[in-house]
Amino acid sequence: MSPKVTKEHKDKRQAEILEAAKTVFKRKGFELTTMKDVVEESGFSRGGVYLYFSSTEEMFRRIIETGLDEGLRKLDKSAEHQSVWASISSYLDELTEGLRDVADTLAPVQFEYLVTAWRNEERRQYLEKRYDLFVERFSRLLQKGIDQGEFQPVQPLATIAKFFLNMNDGIIQNALYFDEEKADVSGLAESAKLYLKTVLQADEK
């Protein structure tokens, strides 16, 4: 009888494999990364990797899901200790700082994955679900601001959430494609704040 593997061990092994996958994705991009690459990077056996993940797509989706969930949970947690507006404003400030070395992040790989989704219906549907999840979660955060008397929005919350996501992605794309001056990440982040402050009629008191 084989020894029982604990959940903690499984979680740890999966996390180690995903870290190896991130390294390869950043080095080679999504399309060119193979399972063999991840196996070699991880140092585990082929069977040891396939036990947890059947493809690089499954790995990348797990990475996307974890990143999105962590980001939204961080926003929610921040809003427990300060106003919703302050939490969103702080997020945009952190985004500006985090994009100084954007080429060394997974952002380029995520855009590569997104660009090819229109040709793959299953992938498009998957991304649509993630999009809907973000809109639902961010709208819920905005509703909390309304309930606390911070906001009096002049557009539907879902529309504001969708536009916020578009602004967020646009800022990241600028940082990827252009030099620091032309990308104007800090200026765009301030413009995003101005839009949100106006459309939400935010009370910063």
Curated annotation (Swiss-Prot):
Residue ranges annotated for the HTH tetR-type domain, each copy included: 11-71
Record feature DNA-binding region, as residue ranges: 34-53
GO molecular function: DNA-binding transcription factor activity; transcription cis-regulatory region binding
Xref: InterPro entries: Homeodomain-like_sf, HTH_TetR, Tet_transcr_reg_TetR-rel_C_sf, YfiR_C
Record field: transmembrane: none
Superkingdom, taxonomy of origin: Bacteria
A GO biological process held by the record: regulation of DNA-templated transcription
Keywords: DNA-binding, Repressor, Transcription, Transcription regulation
Protein name as annotated: Uncharacterized HTH-type transcriptional regulator YfiR
Organism listed in the record: Bacillus subtilis (strain 168)
High-level lineage: Bacteria, Bacillati, Bacillota, Bacilli, Bacillales
